[in-house]
Amino acid sequence: TPLGVAAAQTLMARLFPENPPRLVILREGLTAPAHLSGHMILLPAAALDQTDGPDVVAGYVLAEQLRAQADSATAKLLSYAGLIATVRLLASGSLSATAVEGYAETFLAQAPLPVSNDDLIAAFKAADVSASPYAFALDPTGQSVVALIEKDPFLGGSPRPVLDDGAWVSLQGICTD
């Protein structure tokens, strides 16, 4: 929906004011956050459906952006495709559909790489977002994410809203037609 797309853009501009990545919400096929080349963050629609507010979604996005900075999606694709396919890509400008389809299956089955708590806390602090809602979304007991909770730079809540209520509702409805 247009309002959902606008809300996604607002969220990304709020989290990354200087160079916001594009946020794409996928209704099917994705079970965990991911990133693609071209400065794109992917979230499963369930990440929006199973949370009470935008602070959790902000956490998923911040964590995935850290993964994107540490890990090139293009390099992974070319590594999967192999040397011959990579040389063909350089010579012809295209990659075989077989290589892309095979990598897509592998890509969708991968679990997200871990992100260091210190890097996450720094990202939350830079974005003015509380880390605790994200931490409790990962582990409702808080036991495995106690470091995120204890080091939360905004333990009482984000100092400014991640999204207003209208934008949050629009973002949640992004996949409805």
Regions found by a protein language model. Name each.
Residues R88-D177:
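Metalloprotease/metallohydrolase-associated module, dominated by Zn2+-dependent proteases
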Residues T1-A75, A81, I174-T176:
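Peri-catalytic and regulatory segments of divalent metal-dependent proteins
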Residues A32, D55, L62-P114:
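Soluble catalytic domains of enzymes that build or remodel membrane lipids, polysaccharides, and related
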